[in-house]
Amino acid sequence: MKGTFISIFKGIFSRLDTSLARVPRLRRAADFRAIALLVMAMLSLLMMAGATGCAAKVNPRESLAAQGRAPEGSPKLLAIYQPWFGQKAHIDVGYSCHDPNVLRQQIAKAKELNISGFVVNWYGPRKEFEDQAYGLMQQAASADPSFKVAAQYDEAVDHPGYDTDAVIVDLQYLYDRYIGPEAGPSRNAYLRYNGRPVIFIFPKESNTDWNRIRQVTRSWPDPPLLIYKDMSDKYPDAFDGYYAWVQPGKDGWARDGSNYGEDYLNYFYRNMQEHHPDKIAVGAVWPGFDDSKASWSRNRHIAYRCGKTFEDVLRVFRKYYGSQNAAPYLLVETWNDYEEGTDVERSIGHCGGNSGINSAVAGEQ
């Protein structure tokens, strides 16, 4: 809109001298007044366009396409994917993650937004619905060589006394069923970095012995890279990299949602560059946060600001990583977590409130 007005301005003033030179002085003064009124009207429209929150909606194609190159054969933009919709324990978003047609449509839509992989929240075989949804997603992705999937292993909190053994069992299942040489043809859809499969870790238990787990995974024929949420001082040698995760920062959750995690992101990226240059750094971008629809809600908010939060979070990433020192991956957090309001599937700007959740509850697709 602004570009259109600017073009009109240029057209007016490029012809102004020539046009006015051909008319009498009195008429010239009247023309000046008319033109002045026209320009003032246009400026008012420009100011109104800038003042309305949704006039500057984020265009993910423009916002995300400017990142540096990814390693050959690896997707650069990944999105966290929640596979639990379609069961009664979660809100109705108008689709089931067990519907192959829905999964194919989501992959196609993600690619339109320059996202080339889903990192699927995965709990191991203990949550059968989510495990089946993961398998269906990997199968759908296998039909498109340009799109990949990976697991974000969500550690359990109900294995007191044998946390490490439980994690080993889960990861062995993941490897055998979806990653390893016996996993079947859909294994080609699994995300790899420099030829090695990537597993993201969402930790829950502090008693898990990740050094022991790493010894086990290194013994596999196709050993994976383990990417941990934030940094781990306790097990620095157990992980190949770290990823940032949506949070408000050191000042915590503000009542007005104004804390969007800027200080946390600055610390994460600076710490990765200064103290972990040998590790894989995975950046993050999020549109906001609102867990009011979740059954576990704690009334936590990060204001969306009609796309401004998304832009600000992305700008912090760009301060530290560009074409000269590209991070291999940037995580969009998330694709479809409507219950915590981090979804970008239907709305990045969330103008007028949590429009993603509202359209989801209405069953829009």
Model-predicted segments: where are they?
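Residues at the start of alpha-helices and the adjacent loop-to-helix junctions
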Residues: 22, 33-36, 71, 102
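Bacterial N-terminal signal peptides
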Residues: 35-49
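Glycan-processing catalytic domains of CAZymes
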Residues: 58-365
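Disulfide-bonded cysteine motifs in exported proteins
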Residues: 20, 49-50
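N-terminal secretory signal peptides that target proteins for export/translocation
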Residues: 1-32
